[in-house]
Amino acid sequence: MYYNHKNVLDTEQFSKPDLDFLIGKIRVMERLVEQNKAFGILTGKLLASLFFEASTRTRLSFEAAMERLGGRVISTVGFQFSSISKGETLYDTMKMVEAYADIAVIRHPVEGSSRIAAGAVKIPVINAGDGAGQHPTQAILDLYTIISEKGTLDGLTVAFIGDLKYGRTIHSLINLLRHYKVRLFLISPPELALPESYKKALQGYSLTLEETTDIKAVWDCDVAYVTRIQEERFPDHKEYERLKDLFKINKELILASKKETTVLHPLPRVNELSTDVDDLPNAAYFRQARYGVVSRMTLLCLSLGQDF
């Protein structure tokens, strides 16, 4: 098939054939890594890692992905360590980055910032999270994780639990799941419900959606996607304190499930996912992080036009 996505900015850009192609290529990359044959695919290429908002997993995952492909990385972390702190615009920053690197990965607290970045340059740009907007590479690795863990997506029931209002990983993954025959449970307090714009975007697709405040809905789900309450997005800290502990996933809840509920979490976790879940075989969130490296290795290659 013809895959034509130099930039990875949001999940709306991907069709079902695109996703089928990506899943297949990630499988190929996973085998290459297992056989120690991936190193050297991007030799001579330079990645600019631009993280203007806190990150551990995504930043290290992208940098590890580039290094494992034989490429190199230059980076900046936080506004205080960049010329943006001096008043430089994101546009100007990107024009400078274009002179140094072959591809850029950017995380920024402002929704839509990745589009500004991509519009400024000719090199590929990958969105690693833009405020409460989207996190497309996380969604792709989440999709791959579910398929790897469950064998399929069609026919599954997936629960999203926690902060559905500000959770960009949820926004992105739901956009991808509309291409599959799935049933969604949205489990959150009303104050943190999925924005109406995302619900409307699901209309006309074959999935079904149900909203509830009952955490026990997890018992009927094949997958439980848990997220932390996004403290940094709340304009009112008292509101965060009131809501932060309303939904908690623990071992007792998961063991009571009618299905072998696979537990996912984009991490970091705070109080919403108990550590007593970690030793369950269906706790997949650390495997999820591992799938992230091969997924991002694949996306880096495809954005740079390098087949494998």
Curated annotation (Swiss-Prot):
Enzyme nomenclature, EC number: 2.1.3.2
The keyword Transferase is assigned to this record: yes
Domain of life, source organism: Bacteria
GO biological process: 'de novo' pyrimidine nucleobase biosynthetic process; 'de novo' UMP biosynthetic process; glutamine metabolic process
Gene3D superfamilies documented for this protein: Aspartate/ornithine carbamoyltransferase (3.40.50.1370)
GO CC field: cytoplasm
Keywords: Pyrimidine biosynthesis, Transferase
GO-annotated molecular function: amino acid binding; aspartate carbamoyltransferase activity
UniProt-annotated binding residues for carbamoyl phosphate: 57-58, 107, 135, 138, 267-268
Xref: Pfam families: OTCace, OTCace_N
Residues binding L-aspartate, per UniProt: 86, 168, 228
InterPro entries the UniProt entry points to: Asp/Orn_carbamoyltranf_P-bd, Asp/Orn_carbamoylTrfase, Asp/Orn_carbamoylTrfase_sf, Asp_carbamoyltransf, Asp_carbamoyltransf_Asp/Orn-bd
Family of this protein: Belongs to the aspartate/ornithine carbamoyltransferase superfamily. ATCase family.
Description of how the protein assembles with itself and partners: Heterododecamer (2C3:3R2) of six catalytic PyrB chains organized as two trimers (C3), and six regulatory PyrI chains organized as three dimers (R2).
NCBIfam families membership: asp_carb_tr, PRK00856.1
Full protein name: Aspartate carbamoyltransferase catalytic subunit
Biological source species: Leptospira interrogans serogroup Icterohaemorrhagiae serovar Lai (strain 56601)
